Amino acid sequence: MMEMKYRLWACLLFLPMVLWASGRPKVAVVLSGGGAKGTAHIGALKVIEEAGIPIDYVVGTSMGAIVGGLYSIGYTPQQLDSMVNAQNWKFLLSDAPNPKDVLLDDRLKSERYVLSIPFSLKSVAVSDAGIIKGKNLARLFSTLTEGYQDSVDFSRLPIPFACVSENLVNGSEVVFHEGILATSMRSSMSIPGVFAPVDLDGMGLVDGGMVNNYPVDVALAMGADYIIGVDVQSPLLKASELKSVKDIFGQIINLQGEKKYRENLRNTDVLIKVDVTGYSAASFTKEAIDTLMVRG
């Protein structure tokens, strides 16, 4: 593990010299999906910045779209670190009203609807379209993207950005290059069966992880010459490891996009493969987030 980190640092430190010597090719950072594991992207962005590498594009899926979208409008890795640690994830991953905004009686009633962690179905009110409508997350994204709440061309952001979702109506990949930033980020991480799809222009948009969880091809199509990828995707499980609904559901998602994932890995110049052993998409505890950011 330590040897791999030294090799990575050497590669990143040498990269700026290569870029400048060759006439400054365009560099893209690609951030994979992975739920809570995606908080490791913040640590990786810190390392890339410390190495002095210029970033011309940022592209992401699911949690990679959240981190990437906020980074593209000027949030620093340090600010993202503070923001992630300041959140009440139990509240955000639910449709419960803000405890500060309700009376005690209503607050007690709402407790039955609070989701402890994603994929845990205890005491969760299941809607027709998904477990969580995502109102609290949508509200947070809207607040964090203040100043970018109108429809915008993502190529005109401080760092050009794109993210990936899937249209559940026909299974097609949807790449956001423009629109309302908060809506695009929310659409990219709308896990089917957990979050209700986002209705937009006749589409039912869900998490892009099943069609393109590591969207290197999107970055290349935008004009990137050099790809730095940050991958927090867990490896495929063996038969003996498929022991829970969470394991099975995660395996299905990973298998859907496995072919494209392998192709995108081959087109990556520098890969930061984060060690996510012991953590899942649902590891939103403070201790887990702190560890994942350090591993990134």
Task: Please report, for each region that a protein language model flagged, where it lies by residue.
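Patatin-like phospholipase
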Residues: 21-61, 69-295
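Hydrophobic h-region of N-terminal signal peptides that target proteins for export
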Residues: 12-21
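Bacterial N-terminal signal peptides that target proteins for export
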Residues: 1-10
